[in-house]
A protein has these predicted regions:
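Surface-exposed helix-capping loop/turn segments at secondary-structure junctions
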Residues: 58-61, 103-110, 135, 220, ...
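Short, glycine/charge-rich beta-strand/loop segments that flank catalytic centers
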Residues: 68-72, 93-97, 107-122, 139-149
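Alpha-helical recognition segments enriched in aromatics with Gly/Pro capping
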Residues: 1-34, 49, 99, 120-329
């Protein structure tokens, strides 16, 4: 059975044909560790964990590289605001990130390089870009000269002029052209810095991923992934500098991007002030519920995060756990069941198959296949006792939201809208919150 993926480089769904079937290479942009990850950050973690599983189900060797950006302007700013050292900040956030990955039941990537461990590779790439005529030095900075790369904008499917007009590009007197991006820049006092031919400084963000992917996957590899917000400028710049430094016709063959998570149809982002940190869910709910919620929509479609979604996923897993038995031996998941995942990671289609398998298993037919199919995408990974503990002890709604609902219910009762009051009471009960009325209040 063939794997099909939507390739944003061609804007087509294509059959996945690896460069070398004996060793599949996939690079995914990981976290910039300036703050604990939020639910929006969780989506690529889970989406590409699923793709990793799919690739391993078909190919004997898959190398999955997910980097950690531990040198960046955001990290410097965050450490200054918190009045802690950069190393203490990055170590703390990396630890939290790994705990979040475990909570979401994600496999570890094959490699997880940190940017600060690969500065020499970055310097060598800059030297190669200068030698090839694509980079220039200016006032201790080194820039990539975008207009010299004729395919710039291919991933975004836009002309250079359109990209410049529609984005916030750093303005600097050091640049030859507005669109040029930094490969190396000098560091201020008390900022991270490394010796280089251009003086003490640090690499540009885009360069970091190009250097690390080259080290672990070579000049050309199969899949590059990340969030849709990385298409421009990050991934566009990666392609430009990698192809020009490596003298290659391609960088990555397939470019896969997941859409945003929204709240009230607005992108979830730190800049929006509407984030929900993953760690805040750890003691309230099973990571399986979050994982199922993240898989409930196709990765290319926006996913609106709300209490109803979480409640539905909780109820689904409650139902599935009724027939779960950890003693049952696993079996191979059939091609028919796996087919939606092979068709561009169609997780809603796969979940639909799980519901059908459950209905059969609930009647005593194919329980082994149902449980194995759930485990394939990282579900039913806790025993019944632990699941029951979560269900019994943990509310699925924040205290702030509980108080809001109680106020709404009190208003409904005051207006003698008892139907609405009962609906809110039942909704809270489904989320693990029991309301008892005493003395008519």
């Amino acid at each position: 059975m063939d794997i099909f993926l939507t390739n944003n480089l061609t804007n087509k769904k294509e059959k996945f044909i690896p460069q070398n079937e004996g060793n599949i290479g996939m690079y995914v942009c990981g976290p910039t560790v300036y703050d604990d990850p939020h639910i929006g950050n969780a989506r690529p973690i889970v989406v590409f964990d699923i793709l990793f599983k799919i690739l391993k189900s078909k190919f004997s060797s898959v190398t999955y590289v997910r980097n950690i950006t531990d040198v960046d302007d955001k990290i410097i700013k965050s450490s200054q605001e918190r009045k802690i050292s950069i190393s203490n900040l990055t170590e703390s956030v990396i630890k939290s990130f790994h705990e979040d990955c475990n909570f979401l039941n994600c496999e570890s990537p094959s490699r997880e390089p940190k940017a600060t461990d690969h500065i020499s590779e970055m310097i060598n790439m800059i030297l190669k870009l200068k030698k090839n005529g694509y980079a220039y030095e200016s006032n201790k900075h080194v820039y990539f000269e975008v207009k010299k790369f004729k395919d710039y904008g291919q991933l975004s499917n836009k002309k250079l002029e359109e990209l410049i007009a529609g984005s916030r590009i750093e303005v600097s007197d050091n640049k030859k052209n507005t669109e040029d991006f930094v490969l190396w820049k000098p560091s201020n006092e008390n900022e991270p810095s490394w010796d280089s031919p251009w003086g003490k400084g640090r690499p540009g963000w885009h360069l970091e991923c190009s250097a690390m992917s080259k080290k672990f996957l070579g000049n050309e590899f199969d899949i590059h992934g990340g969030g849709i917000d990385l298409i421009f400028p990050h991934h566009e710049n990666e392609i430009a500098q990698s192809r020009c430094a490596n003298d290659s016709k391609i960088f990555a063959k397939y470019w896969i991007h997941n859409a945003f998570i929204t709240m009230s149809n607005e992108k979830m982002a730190k800049s929006q002030g509407n984030i929900l940190k993953i760690k805040d869910f750890r003691n309230k709910i099973s990571g399986q519920v979050i994982r199922l919620a993240l898989l409930s929509a196709h990765y290319k479609q926006p996913l609106d995060w709300n209490d109803k979604l979480i409640s539905e996923c909780q109820n689904t897993l409650n139902k599935w756990y009724r027939i779960y038995d950890k003693k049952i031996k696993s079996v191979d998941v059939t091609k028919e069941v796996l087919k939606p995942l092979y068709e561009d990671l169609n997780t809603p289609g796969y979940i639909s198959n799980l519901h059908q398998l459950f209905d059969k298993a609930n009647k005593g037919e194919g329980k082994e296949l149902f449980i194995s199919a759930c485990k394939f995408i990282g579900l039913l990974n806790e025993d019944n006792e632990k699941w029951e503990k979560y269900k019994k002890d943990k509310a699925l709604i924040s205290e702030v939201e509980i108080n809001k609902r109680i106020d709404l219910r009190n208003n409904a009762r005051a207006n003698k809208d008892y139907k609405e009051a009962d609906r809110i009471r039942d909704e809270l009960f489904d989320k693990g919150v029991l309301i008892e009325d005493k003395d008519g209040k």
